[in-house]
């Protein structure tokens, strides 16, 4: 009898759970849901974008402590260092007659923290511009500061997620005709009003030209010549391009018939064979493009006998028809000669050598100072590695002067002001030398960064103030005062 009851009970439990399972499958939990139509949540309209879209210049912020920034009067400071290597692309400038050197230690005027990188500042009419990378926002950020105080006036930024690769930021802005132009690490070109930060136009070089961004990101700095911006996207079809500075429209383009790819180098203007020329070292070789009149954008010549896989320094003209080429990672240096006979151009490598065999550089572009060539030798430069060195254009294998054995600068930058050379060790120590035709004399050295790391970004000078940076900090030193 108990066994029979247990059987009935078991059957009943099984039937119950079968019914429960069937009901669970038949029940529709969304039967009473109401579909929410677009706009029903009353949220403001957003941007519709694809996963890889970058809305260049999307965000803007003005410093609330500077409410008059957008309508400010011209600054009393008129000094300019408006682009990579200054306006003449020679990395040199002069003191105004009204100024004199600060003797001894130079005073720090201000200091600003940045995202990790090597993007360097420019100066125009009392303002400082730098294309930083905000690691918290994953964004390129054009920041504008007051030169005298270091206070941020405004910034414009856009999201572009990246992975750290020796930091993030790389390039130097260009300022001209009231505008500031930047190129981000991933090839995003942005043009803004230099006073207000108002967005003017933008170009994504990867999307428009099919540019392949170098492994260590874009190092190319924008070149402004008159009313046009010159870029070397080195994309699938376009080697070089001229952009209307005011509108962002394309003025001319050079077909990439040579098949070059983008390097870390920048376009340099030169006069060769009596012709204004844009010279560029790409991955694959070096080329010259006409910058004149109706021939603008015409490929005049190219050479591929010297083609390092990684190029950071830019080409340096050392005579009316000779260009010094240099790169790191074992590439060494080379001498390129460009000749013209009527409409016929020839470009040939006249000399090339390893870094330990002559004048070379890994990152910084050398300086041509009154016929003497100044460089910091690379890590593979033999016994003189990382030292300052001076060469003659007619002998690139034997220096006429080098810095002392304990004066080694790594990948640090250097510039010339009047007859003084300022060289910045990559660990944050500044050296000042008196320049002579065949030598330099050390005048002063000063620790600027207490624990400087990777101080590779180029320096800038204007109105008595020198801007320097390491991987995470920009500092301003007062190096000259009014008489």
Segments predicted by a language model, with ranges:
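Structural motif
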Residues: 137-141, 237-241, 285-290, 330-337, ...
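Loop/turn-rich, solvent-exposed surfaces of beta-rich toroidal or solenoidal domains
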Residues: 331, 357-437
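Aromatic (tryptophan-biased) beta-strands that constitute blades/sheets of beta-rich domains
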Residues: 4-10, 22-114, 140-162, 198-211, ...
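Residue position within the beta-strands of beta-propeller blades
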Residues: 128-130, 182, 231, 280, ...
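Extracytoplasmic beta-rich repeat domains
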Residues: 109-122, 137-138, 155-174, 202-224, ...
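Short loop/turn segments immediately following the C-termini of beta-strands
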Residues: 86-89, 133-135, 185, 234-235, ...
């Amino acid at each position: 009898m108990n066994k029979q009851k247990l059987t009935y009970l078991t059957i009943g439990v099984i039937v119950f759970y079968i019914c429960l399972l069937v009901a669970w499958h038949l029940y529709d939990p969304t039967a009473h849901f109401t579909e929410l139509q677009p706009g029903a949540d009353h949220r403001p309209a957003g941007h519709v974008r694809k996963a890889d879209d970058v809305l260049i210049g999307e965000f803007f912020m003005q410093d609330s402590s500077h409410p008059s920034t957008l309508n400010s009067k011209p600054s009393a400071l008129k000094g300019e260092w408006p682009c990579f290597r200054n306006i003449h692309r020679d990395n040199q400038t002069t003191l105004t007659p009204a100024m004199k050197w600060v003797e001894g230690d130079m005073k720090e005027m201000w200091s600003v923290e940045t995202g990790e990188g090597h993007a360097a500042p420019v100066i125009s009419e009392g303002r400082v511009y730098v294309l930083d990378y905000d690691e918290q926002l994953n964004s390129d950020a054009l920041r504008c500061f007051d030169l005298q105080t270091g206070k941020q006036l405004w910034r414009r930024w856009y999201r572009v997620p990246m992975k750290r690769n020796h930091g993030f930021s790389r390039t130097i802005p260009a300022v001209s005709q009231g505008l500031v132009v930047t190129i981000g690490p991933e090839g995003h070109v942005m043009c803004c009003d230099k006073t207000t930060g108002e967005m003017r136009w933008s170009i994504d070089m990867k999307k428009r030209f099919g540019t392949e961004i170098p492994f260590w990101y874009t190092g190319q700095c924008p070149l402004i010549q008159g009313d046009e911006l010159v870029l070397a996207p080195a994309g699938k079809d376009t080697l070089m391009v001229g952009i209307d500075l005011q509108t962002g429209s394309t003025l001319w383009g050079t077909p990439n018939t040579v098949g070059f790819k983008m390097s870390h180098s920048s376009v340099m203007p030169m006069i060769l064979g009596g012709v204004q020329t844009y010279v560029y070292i790409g991955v694959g070789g070096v080329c010259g493009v006409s910058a004149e009149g109706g021939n603008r954008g015409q490929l005049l010549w190219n050479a591929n006998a010297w083609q390092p896989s990684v190029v950071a320094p830019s080409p340096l003209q050392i005579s009316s028809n000779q260009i010094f080429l240099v790169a790191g990672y074992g590439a060494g240096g080379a001498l390129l000669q460009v000749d013209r006979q009527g409409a016929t151009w020839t470009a040939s490598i006249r000399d090339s050598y390893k870094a330990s065999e002559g004048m070379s550089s890994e990152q910084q572009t050398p300086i041509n100072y009154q016929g003497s060539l100044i460089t910091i030798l690379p890590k593979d430069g033999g016994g003189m590695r990382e030292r300052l060195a001076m060469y003659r254009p007619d002998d690139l294998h034997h220096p006429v002067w080098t810095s002392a054995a304990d004066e080694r600068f790594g990948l640090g930058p250097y510039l010339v002001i009047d007859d003084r050379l300022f060289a910045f060790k990559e660990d944050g120590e500044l050296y000042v030398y008196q320049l002579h035709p065949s030598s330099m004399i050390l005048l002063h050295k000063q620790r600027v960064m207490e624990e400087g790391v990777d101080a590779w970004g180029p320096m800038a000078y204007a109105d008595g103030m020198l801007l320097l940076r390491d991987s995470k900090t920009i500092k301003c030193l007062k190096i000259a005062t009014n008489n």
